[in-house]
């Protein structure tokens, strides 16, 4: 298999999604000639370039807001760090310490990223950061980074506004995602046209461009980025969810599983389309999503329909309790959550009623 270029978007704790995707790509046999990343994507990129999968898992298992930055204890809850009511507390931290001390992050990275191993891997590495001193982006490749300063450059690509200076020189740096959070152009400009993009954020950056050329680009990303949760949520529950989402979405991107909102074996989904029709299958997936059927697993037809019918029965019971005097079928069509069209799920309802 020919090697790909790899583009890794930034997105804080959502970066574990990229690790799950990487596991799937390793199983498929995908290899990379170059990896470019922004923010957490640059950190994952260094681990991927050096093929340090076990170290990457350990780093993410160790990662937390507590170990990532040094900040007042009452701000360490990810929901509190940037909340409006805590801005005065955050500003006091910045004023008192000259910024938020990011040195714990460097200590954490030093445990798991081996610069020598990265340099000897034969895989090129690139990152983007934004210089507040020069007010311009900096695209940097591994060959441009002095020996012993890789971690400083990775941190310079990942700067939260107000973070203390720990960059490669006297410049002040900001997260490179403000310029381009999905740096496809960085590869295209350097002659790479065959690439995989693992996207984990709705933020694109000031200079991001949509690519409309003959490049071969495979995108791996969730159907709904919001399913990845908050960028500072390092909880164990979200770790597992993001990892598994990345794994399944990568397999889907390479055609090993199928489905739009859910994951099915290729033959399973073909059989469902042959039996119910493409429009009905689209409705079944959408209805399953609306009613809360678990998405992060690979379904066969029986398991999927059983899970959907169970949710459908719960929904019928709820409607029956709320609208006992109305005709049930009519009520279903009118009461489907966030439905834009009263007939949006008509085919799905008919299938479920018959089964």
Spans of model-derived segments:
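Patatin-like phospholipase
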Residues: 1-38, 46-355
